[in-house]
Amino acid sequence: MDAIKKKMQAMKLEKDNAMDRADTLEQQNKEANNRAEKSEEEVFSLQKRMQQLENDLDSVQEALLKANQHLEEKDKALSNAEGEVAALNRRIQLLEEDLERSEERLNTATTKLAEASQAADESERMRKVLENRSLSDEERMDALENQLKEARFLAEEADRKYDEVARKLAMVEADLERAEERAETGESKIVELEEELRVVGNNLKSLEVSEEKANQREEAYKEQIKTLTNKLKAAEARAEFAERSVQKLQKEVDRLEDELVNEKEKYKSITDELDQTFSELSGY
C-alpha cells in the first residue's frame, strides 16, 4: 500500500513535472510561434523592402542612365563651348593684333600729319618771307624808278642846257664873225664858253652812263623780281600740295579712327558674347 502510495506520489510528481514540462514546452512553443510569426513578418517586411529597394534601384539606374546621357550631352556641349571659346580667343587675338596695327598706322599717320603741318607752317612762313621780300623789292623798284625818272629829268635838263649852250655858242660864233676885230679881247670869253661846253658835255655823258647803269639795274631787278615771283609761285604750289597732303592724311586719320571705333565695338561685342557664354556655362 505504501509502495502504491509512493508510486502514485511518484507518478503524481512525474505528472506534475510532465505538466510543468508541458507548460514549459507550450510556452516555448508559443514563444517559438511568436518568433516564427515575427520572423515571417520580418521576412515579409524584408521582402517588401527588397521589392521597394529593387524598384528604387530600377529608378536609380534609370535616373543614372538619364544623368549619364545628360552628362554626355553636357560634356559634348562643354567641348563645343570650349572650341567656340578657343575660336573666340583666336579671333580676339587677331582683333588685338589688328587693333595694334591700326594704332601703329594711326601713330604713323599722326606723325606724318604733324610733319605735314610743320612743312605747311614752314611753307607759309617762307611765303610770308617771300611776300615781304617782294614788297621790299617793289619798294626798291619804286625807288629805282624814282631815281630813273630823276636821271631822265636831269638828262632832259642837260639836253636843254646843251641846246641852250649850243644856241649861245652859235650866237657867240656869230658875234665872233661880226667882231673878229675883237677876237683878242673875246678869246678868254670863248675859252670860258668852251670850258663850260666841255663840262656840260661831260655831265651829259655822265648822265648817259648813269642812265645806262640805271637801265641795267632795272633789268637786273626785273629779272630778280621774276625769279622771286617764280619762287613764290613754286612755294605756293608746294603749300597747296602740302595742304592737299594734310587733307588726305586727315581723311586717312578719320578712316583709321572709324576703323578703330568699329574694332572696339566688335571687341566689346565679342567680350559680351564671351561673358554670356561663361555665364551660361556657370549656370550648368
UniProtKB/Swiss-Prot annotation:
Alphabetical keyword list: Acetylation, Allergen, Coiled coil, Muscle protein, Repeat
Reported function: Tropomyosin, in association with the troponin complex, plays a central role in the calcium dependent regulation of muscle contraction.
Record-given protein name: Tropomyosin Mac r 1.0101
Pfam families: Tropomyosin
Bias type Basic and acidic residues, positions: 12-38
Gene Ontology biological-process annotations: locomotion; muscle system process; regulation of muscle contraction
SUPFAM superfamilies from the UniProt entry: Tropomyosin (SSF57997)
Comment field on protein domains: The molecule is in a coiled coil structure that is formed by 2 polypeptide chains. The sequence exhibits a prominent seven-residues periodicity.
Coiled coil: 1-273
Tissue specificity note: Expressed in muscle (at protein level). Expressed in abdominal muscle.
Annotated stretches, region: Disordered: 1-42
GO molecular function, one term: protein homodimerization activity
Quaternary data: Homodimer.
Family statement: Belongs to the tropomyosin family.
InterPro entries noted in UniProt: Tropomyosin
